[in-house]
């Protein structure tokens, strides 16, 4: 559906830097900008094109008709969108921010008519941050949500060609595409991304409260359970606080299950129900990632109802693995 292959990345930390590398690997013409002198110097030192400031990068994007990708913390989105409106007001726009509904709302407030926006979010990362933590293969095999929100609000919905371009970028970066609405993404991410950061923080603090002996005994289960607690605190705050409503719902669910486990342990001396439920849930997760072939279908983006069909399939856990012209190959 699209042959465009030019990409402007705003933000060159872990995710933005990895997108720039992966897109370059796939043959895109790429450049970026960042407010971090450290990341700018590191990227330029590896031969990447780094514009002197965000405005310069966006003006080049406007001149070259490039896709613009925002890879900044949620707290910086409003300022960057103001720059987009000033320097590239009719661009094709996406983002990789960890929350989608609040970003869409910010787009409504700041962009001018003619901006064509499709939100996205790769579900990949590490506990480290910055350009040095990124790599071209960070997204290989990872799910990458590409929003399928519709409706008449042109400030937060682009045409199918832009959706295909963003999905094509995700596929070129090595990911598979999961179609979902912004609200569906935020509800799911609260449970499988944002809540784990809070639980890891609590687990790390509880372990530390046990004193030097407890930390000396910390091994695999403690290390695995607290890995993301090593992430930059301000980045975690931006992600979690930006998804407050959905995260509170997920946290209530977790607290309810922890309360049930405590009650069972206190009254019976056992925790069988909690452990069995968690074991089965983990096995189901592993099976969903195991590559079992449940068949595939094709969805032609030019047919009526195509985006709603993709949303329905994404809701069932299906993923787009290839894009041939206007046809999406969807694995069930």
Where are the model-predicted features located?
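NAD(P)+-binding Rossmann beta1-loop-alpha1 motif at the extreme N-terminus of oxidoreductases
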Residues: 1-53, 59-62
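Rossmann-like NAD(P)-binding element
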Residues: 54-94
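Internal alpha-helical scaffold of NAD(P)-dependent oxidoreductase catalytic cores
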Residues: 138-230
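Rossmann-like NAD(P)(H) cofactor-binding subdomain of soluble oxidoreductases
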Residues: 80-131
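Hydrophobic Val/Ile/Leu positions in short beta-strands of Rossmann-like dinucleotide-binding domains
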Residues: 8-9, 70, 146
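Interdomain hinge/lid region at the active-site interface
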Residues: 213-286
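NAD(P)-dependent dehydrogenase/reductase Rossmann-like domain
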Residues: 258, 265-267, 271-332
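Phosphate-coordination loops involved in phosphoryl transfer and adenosine-cofactor binding
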Residues: 3-6, 90, 141
